Amino acid sequence: MANTENCPKVGIVMGSDSDMPVMAKAADILEELGIPYEMTVISAHREPDVFFEYAKSAEEKGFKVIIAGAGMAAHLPGMCAAIFPMPVIGIPMHTTSLGGRDSLYSIVQMPSGIPVATVANAGLLAAKILATSDAELLGKLKAYSTKLKEQVEAKDAKLQEIGYKAYLEGMKK
């Protein structure tokens, strides 16, 4: 489900629906910050013509960033970066054979001139990229950071009040 209030600014693409639980985290933060996006499943290997059309049309659709997740050979993020002229954030997926190391290496070891950012918090990085030219979004990101800070402060206050043993016990519930 995409936020369709405006033209999507972020494309979220994954090679398989099994990647959805991880990719949904990026969608969740984009929704929280009010950033319109489009989410789709495309296999770069099984439907290359559909993939090429997606990557070629992304700029025309208004995308400013693509978040691409893939496992195993994980060519999806790199191929997006080869075609799409704006930032691509790659998310390596866990795999059963190598625990995701194959995906990670495939995404981070790109040839010169074809960068793919590979980070945790891909949705937040996409938002920060967009915020470089959007003052309203920058304000939302600052408020989000303040909220996170306040959550940590509240946890520490609770720890100081009840002690670590009671805190740990409360975490088990």
Question: Where on the chain are the PLM-derived regions?
Answer:
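Basic/polar N-terminal segments that are highly enriched at the extreme N-terminus
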Residues: 1-7, 173
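Glycine-rich phosphate/diphosphate-binding loop of Rossmann-like nucleotide-binding domains
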Residues: 5-46
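Glycine-rich phosphate-binding loop
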Residues: 54-92
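Glycine-rich phosphate/pyrophosphate-binding loop and the adjoining helix
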Residues: 133-173
